[in-house]
Swiss-Prot record:
Stored CDD domains: AAT_like
UniProt cofactor(s): pyridoxal 5'-phosphate
The encoding gene: aspC
Protein name, UniProt field: Aspartate/prephenate aminotransferase
PANTHER family linked to this entry: ASPARTATE AMINOTRANSFERASE
């Protein structure tokens, strides 16, 4: 009998991907549109990384790779996690995946049985709940509040823990809020994972895009309970190369590799050699990251100053490249607000699928000129131009 599975029918397409695709299509049709939708850097991949890919091609490094990644990259990852995150891991405790998204997908497939609960802090990246449900898990939302800077309250998290809790997902710096969780908060959450014996899934994909404070990896507190997920996409402007990576307990990493072996086989071999260059040519990569970070900082400040001048509220982000903007001055809800802004020539992502109701997400991974245009169009929507 033909038909789609119930689990696929229950899965929602990614809202952020859909909105960005719509914005790109409108642009292709000639619509004058400022898109503040992209969850990716607007910079090109650094030249030293592209050159490494060309070398790999010239050297014929085009065959299958092992499911967990080429050994050279796993060794570099173990060193990266030690050097930058303070995590004592071996190459066997690392894995390379087809983007950070696959690392998370494989992880939930590896650890969840039907009915297992996963605590997800809201607002959240749109894919966390869908991945959990697809693996048979149950999503338990714990709210973070704008008046608290969208930083989680460990006691609120504690109250959500049950005997069925299998994991807690944390994402700092955060998408969509830009919040950076203080060290003491992450330490408290890590201690909860140890106390109640569940996994702490730490998504650190934006670790290098930090404007205030310091990045802290909770795996330093609870190494046997923590899976640290990261990737090349955001730091090195490599979104299309599709290289993610993770580290954690060896038995979980091995299970994640088994999922890869029966699905994608392995990440792109050439992209792995390029990522190896990004991780090991530290001087060139550091210069690129610092350049990008300072550009994002300027853009963030420009956008926040403009929103404030228009009377629009947003919690100041300390990391990533997103702002959650309160939509109450524009429309009764975030969906209608996004529609009004689109009519004015600005594409944004409604907060609905982030569980950020009454807000839209603005990405400042675009030029300062585009941000100024967007602010001018916001002013027209508000009747102030």
């Amino acid at each position: 009998m033909r038909g789609l599975s119930r689990r696929v029918q229950a899965m929602k397409p990614s809202a952020t991907v859909a909105v960005n695709a719509k914005a790109l299509e409108l642009r292709r049709q000639g619509v004058d549109l400022v898109a503040l939708t992209a969850g990716e850097p607007d910079f090109d991949t650094p030249e030293h990384v592209k050159e490494a890919a060309r070398r790999a091609l010239a050297q014929g490094k085009t065959k299958y790779a092992p499911p967990a990644g080429i050994p050279e990259l796993r060794e570099a990852l173990a060193e990266k996690f030690r050097r930058e995150n303070g995590l004592s891991v071996t190459p066997e405790e690392t894995i390379v995946t087809v983007g950070g998204k696959q690392a998370l997908f494989n992880l939930f497939q590896a650890i969840l049985d039907p009915g297992d609960e996963v605590i997800v802090l809201s607002p959240y990246w749109v894919s966390y709940p869908e991945m959990v449900r697809f693996a048979g898990g149950v999503v338990v939302e714990v709210e973070t509040l704008p008046e608290e800077g969208f930083v989680p309250d460990p006691e609120r998290v504690r109250r959500a823990i049950t005997p069925r809790t299998k994991a807690l997902v944390v994402n700092s710096p955060n998408n969509p809020t830009g919040a950076v969780y203080p060290k003491e908060v992450l330490e408290a959450l890590a201690r909860l994972a140890v106390e109640h014996d569940f996994y702490l899934v730490s998504d650190e994909i934006y670790e290098h895009l930090l404007y205030e404070g310091e990045h802290f990896s909770p795996g330093r507190v609870a190494p046997e309970h923590t899976l640290t997920v990261n990737g090349a996409a955001k730091a090195f402007a490599m979104t299309g190369w599709r290289i993610g990576y993770a580290c954690g307990p060896k038995e979980v990493i091995k299970a994640m590799a088994s999922v890869s072996s029966q699905s994608t086989t392995s990440p792109d071999t050439i992209a792995q050699w390029a990522t190896l260059e990004a991780l090991t040519n530290q001087e060139a990569s550091r210069a690129f990251v610092e350049m990008a970070r300072e550009a994002y900082r300027r853009r963030r400040d420009l956008l926040l100053e403009g929103l404030t001048a228009l009377g629009l509220k947003a919690v100041r982000p300390s990391g990533a490249f997103y702002v959650l903007m309160d939509t109450s001055p524009i429309a009764p809800d975030e969906v209608r607000a996004a529609e009004r802004l689109l009519e004015a020539g600005v594409a944004v992502v409604p907060g609905t699928d982030f569980a950020a109701f009454g807000h839209v997400r603005l990405s400042y991974a675009t030029s300062e000129e585009n941000l100024r245009k967007a602010l001018e169009r916001f002013a027209r929507v508000l009747g102030r131009a």
